[in-house]
Amino acid sequence: MTEGEVGVGLLDTSVFIARESGGAIADLPERVALSVMTIGELQLGLLNAGDSATRSRRADTLALARTADQIPVSEAVMISLARLVADCRAAGVRRSVKLTDALIAATAEIKV
């Protein structure tokens, strides 16, 4: 990135969860984006909310996430995902690689 160029930060689901929980969040880039997988993860959290207060907080978090640029799952992202998972397996990392996290990482590799 050159001087004066604005970077885009790809936000992971954990950033939204930290904000919802009142956790500390470092300064974010001026422009942010997210994988549509993050929308799915936040929607799942909303659907699994056990009470109305949690449901309300999660609905607010999902609404905030929807204001960011959403990056769709494309063929390039899926190819990157396959390579990332294969590389992890080749390095001996198997069960600890969550496909949702790998998909978000693949999105970051392609788009950011």
UniProtKB/Swiss-Prot annotation:
Which controlled-vocabulary keywords does the entry list?
Answer: Hydrolase, Magnesium, Metal-binding, Nuclease, Toxin-antitoxin system
Q: Which organism is it from?
A: Mycobacterium tuberculosis (strain CDC 1551 / Oshkosh)
Molecular function terms in GO for this entry?
A: metal ion binding; nuclease activity
Q: Name one Pfam family in it.
A: PIN
Q: What is this protein called?
A: Ribonuclease VapC8
Family to which the UniProt record says this protein belongs: Belongs to the PINc/VapC protein family.
Domain of life, per lineage: Bacteria
Its taxonomic placement starts with: Bacteria, Bacillati, Actinomycetota, Actinomycetes, Mycobacteriales
> Which Enzyme Commission number(s) are on file for it?
3.1.-.-
Question: Which co-factors does it depend on?
Answer: Mg(2+)
Task: Provide the top EC class.
Answer: hydrolase
Q: What is the gene called?
A: vapC8
